[in-house]
């Protein structure tokens, strides 16, 4: 049950990060998704 919750939260973070950082440059971080590049965001950076 806890694993499912973690996966749902992780997906939400990725979606929010992608929507917020589209077209930007830099790193995508867990704490500051506004600093990110466009593309697929991970918890470390963007591709």
From Swiss-Prot:
Where do the TM regions start and end? none
Keywords for the protein's UniProt record, in alphabetical order: Disulfide bond, Neurotoxin, Secreted, Signal, Toxin
User: What does the tissue specificity note say?
Assistant: Expressed by the venom duct.
GO terms for molecular function, please? Answer: toxin activity
| Leader sequence segment | 1-19
Q: What is this protein called in UniProt?
A: Conotoxin Cal6.18
Gene Ontology cellular-component terms listed: extracellular region
**What does the PTM comment of the record read?**
May contain 3 disulfide bonds.
Q: Which family does it belong to?
A: Belongs to the conotoxin O1 superfamily.
Could you tell me which cysteines form disulfide bridges?
Answer: none
Superkingdom is: Eukaryota
- Please classify the protein's predominant subcellular localization into one broad category: secreted
What organism does the UniProt record list as the source?
Californiconus californicus (California cone)
**Domain commentary:** The cysteine framework is C-C-C-CC-C-C.
Please state where this protein is localized.
Answer: Secreted
Q: What does this protein do, in the record's words?
A: Probable neurotoxin.
């Amino acid at each position: 049950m806890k694993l499912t919750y973690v996966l749902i939260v992780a997906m939400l973070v990725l979606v929010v990060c992608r929507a917020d950082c589209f077209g930007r440059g830099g790193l995508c971080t867990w704490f500051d998704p506004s600093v990110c590049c466009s593309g697929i965001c991970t918890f470390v950076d963007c591709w």
